[in-house]
Amino acid sequence: MEKELINNSQSNIYPFHMPGHKRRGSDIGAGLDPYAIDITEIDNFDNLHHAEGIIKEAQAEAAALYGAKRAYFLINGSTCGILAAVSAATKRGDKVLVARNCHKAVYHALYLRQLHPVFIYPEITRTGLQGQITEAQIRAAFDENPDIKAVVITSPTYDGVVSDVAAIASVAHEHGALLIVDEAHGAHFGFGGGFHQNAIALGADAVIVSLHKTLPAFTQTALLLLGGMREAAVEKFLGIYETSSPSYVLMTGIERCIHYVRDNKETAFAQLRSRLDRFYQKVSGLSHLNVVRKSDFSADEAYDFDESKIIIFTKEAMNGHTLLELLLKKYELQLEMAAGNYVLALASVMDTDEGFDRLADALIEIDSQLEKYKSDFEEFYDILKQEGVVHKFYLPVKMDTDIYQKLPAVMEMYDAYDADHQAVYAFKASGKVSGAFINIYPPGIPLVVPGEIMNDKLIDDVIKAVNSGLEVDGLDFDPDANMWKFVAVL
């Protein structure tokens, strides 16, 4: 592992992926040997779970930066903060309004606290991305379920789609419910550069931000920010979900990140915006690839769009996985992820002019090659295979706008998850109660959750996704029969 990590760090591969420090720790003053500062809770170094000294001061600095009532360091990642926030906002058996596109940690919290979810579904955009959650959806859900105790949404999404958090917070508070926002992909919000305001400033009661995703911080470092949620309840559940052996290396990394943003926000985010604008201008004339901008979304699809999420659609030419592989092997650009018809590159304040130029130049060259071979794309792929830069070709797969069905639930999710299960072949699964989550990555929205009844369309959609080269989680494969199996409740 160490050898591979060193090789990667010394290579010419440019990281358009998280973590947001982009392997440039020296640029934020991170020069210490991690072993030299790796300690436990010895005298004068405070205790994360009973912070009274230097950790308390560092957390107060984070709260001040984001405008929060309190901030808690998370060194188990945003997952820990999501579990704590949902648990603190509810009592066992409560009803919770949950955006279906929430992170799996939200579903784990529903399971652990035996909560009853009411799901709302984001619209799928014309291009196949998951869209926003709207104020109207939230209001309609409360009209049907006035006993909802908490609302949980993700904004921005992995792809950068932002919902109207202020309006959603207003509706939730009007009905006496708390609003929890998974803002893991928006830790850079609220600091200028034309990026959206952060959810705490917009009225959310608890907000989880993953510093490591978009800011210069170590992987698995995050913050739980409080607005209107009770501190005592949050601290109780952080004591359960967060490690009792917190890393001072990671906590110091959080503090360093907070100081960097505090001291450089006036220039760093404006510079990032300038670099993004220059990049988008360079690639605006592509014919066979399409780089998305905010103007590509209708008002119904997105309240706002985070342009530090660089989405490159492949149109008719190739699958996202093919483009991802081509960019890595030929151009030494490692992007964040690939989908059926697009790839995603993540930009941060630590990216350089060189990085953006390399990505723009690569896309322009690929687009020109696609134009050259537009009458016979197969010839182009044959050349790429001969060069060893692409090993497999998939056709583009656009996510159907109706793929996320509202399936009937006949069991509580936690009961179905704990029940005895059987693996059934695809052709026998329709009509059975799911015992597992089935997700297509990206975007990772569960097509079915435990307790819901599977139907023919679900099974057809899942098998289609597998055959198209997409990553599908929640299935079993029988190599002897060469068939997929679905997990069903006995």
Which residues make up each language-model segment?
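Conserved PLP-enzyme active-site core in the AAT-like
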Residues: 2-6, 28-29, 50, 65-68, ...
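Conserved N-terminal alpha-helix of the aminotransferase class I/II PLP-enzyme fold
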Residues: 35-77
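Flexible, glycine-rich loop/tail regions that form catalytic "lids" or insertion modules at the edges
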Residues: 43, 422-426, 478-490
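Short glycine-rich or small-residue beta-strand-to-loop segments that form or flank ligand, phosphate
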Residues: 45, 72-74, 151-154, 344-348
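Short, compositionally biased
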Residues: 113-119, 467-482
